[in-house]
């Protein structure tokens, strides 16, 4: 389906990203990394506490685009805690303790304060919960936006692992869910031009649809939501499908580097692989303990 508030979100995101490109957001007015308060809360509504993380690293384009999009809404209270360097394909790996995790105060590419954690994506979540949320936990963890799709529960030939299992973006989200915090993992499709702006629109739309439930603590945490957004080189995103993870890939899509056909007319697409590569945003549940993430935390 095409969501009715997409145009308004596109305009808001475009404005926010344009201001960021002009340097209007580089003054770091969102707060200080390493403190419990960041982001705007001047909208008069209850603030939504959002922890943003990823696996591409705190300086990556995807997390920067997401944070700038979130800042458009003054009711979003944003804290960023992400790996200091690129930790792609680290799944739900965590640094053995002791020693304690280390982090440095840094910023996103547009200058928003962040904690750069010397560790994996799951470590970044743990660091934030233990050091940056001293009073109340976040209402939600947003992991992404990843630079490359994460679709399918099928072997991709990388150490004989499965696509959703090796994703640090998904691993961070599962870690949050295992700790009782709702989480969304978002990934932008590969292509000549990575369309993070469309990814931001879809994440913000998900956030608005779930804002009331997140504030009320009513979003289930037995699974996380895995959102994949096409980067259309031609045509337009066809809509969104709520579909399960694919368990096979009979059409031979290149799951890691394959481009998406947004001009496709294929219908009745049964899973995330078929939906995504035929131009749809796909939303799929991933069990939080799929790879024993929760068991490792207990």
Regions found by a protein language model. Give the residues of each.
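Active-site histidine-anchored catalytic micro-motif
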Residues: 46, 137, 143-174, 178-184, ...
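Ser/Thr-rich, Pro/Gly/Ala-heavy low-complexity intrinsically disordered linkers and tails
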Residues: 19-46
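A cross-family phosphate/adenosyl-ligand binding-site feature
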Residues: 46, 50, 68-130
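N-terminal secretory signal peptides that target proteins for export/translocation
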Residues: 1-6
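Active-site-proximal beta-strand/loop segments in catalytic clefts of secreted hydrolases
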Residues: 53-56, 81-86, 117-120, 143-147, ...
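Electrostatically charged, flexible surface regions
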Residues: 90, 197-298
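Mobile, glycine-rich extracellular loop/lid and propeptide segments
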Residues: 58, 62-70, 126, 131-133, ...
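Bacterial N-terminal signal peptides
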Residues: 10-21
């Amino acid at each position: 389906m095409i969501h009715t508030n997409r145009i308004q979100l596109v305009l808001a995101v475009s404005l926010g990203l344009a201001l960021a490109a002009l340097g209007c957001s580089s003054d770091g007015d969102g707060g200080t990394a390493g403190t419990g308060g960041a982001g705007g809360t001047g909208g008069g509504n209850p603030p939504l506490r959002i922890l943003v993380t990823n696996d591409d690293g705190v300086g990556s384009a995807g997390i920067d685009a997401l944070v700038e999009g979130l800042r458009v809404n003054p009711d979003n209270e944003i804290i960023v805690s992400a790996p200091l360097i690129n930790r792609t394909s680290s799944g739900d790996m965590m640094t053995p303790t002791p020693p304690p995790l280390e982090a440095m105060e840094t910023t996103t590419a547009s200058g928003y304060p962040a904690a750069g954690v010397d560790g994996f994506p799951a470590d970044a979540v743990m660091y934030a919960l233990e050091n940056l949320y001293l009073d109340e936990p976040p209402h939600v963890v947003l992991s992404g936006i990843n630079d490359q799709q994460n679709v399918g529960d099928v072997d991709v030939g990388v150490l004989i692992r499965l696509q959703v299992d090796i994703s640090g973006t998904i691993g961070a989200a599962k870690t949050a869910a295992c700790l009782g915090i709702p989480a969304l993992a978002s990934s932008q499709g590969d292509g000549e031009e990575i369309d993070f702006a469309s990814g931001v629109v879809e994440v913000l739309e998900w956030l608005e649809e779930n804002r009331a439930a997140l504030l009320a603590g009513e979003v289930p945490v037995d699974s996380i939501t895995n959102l994949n957004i096409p980067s259309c080189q031609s045509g337009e995103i066809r809509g969104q499908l709520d579909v399960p993870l694919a368990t096979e890939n009979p059409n031979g899509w290149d799951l890691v580097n394959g481009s998406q056909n947004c001009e496709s007319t294929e219908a009745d697409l049964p899973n995330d692989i078929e939906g995504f590569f035929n131009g749809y945003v796909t939303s799929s549940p991933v069990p939080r303990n799929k790879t024993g993430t929760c068991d490792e935390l207990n």
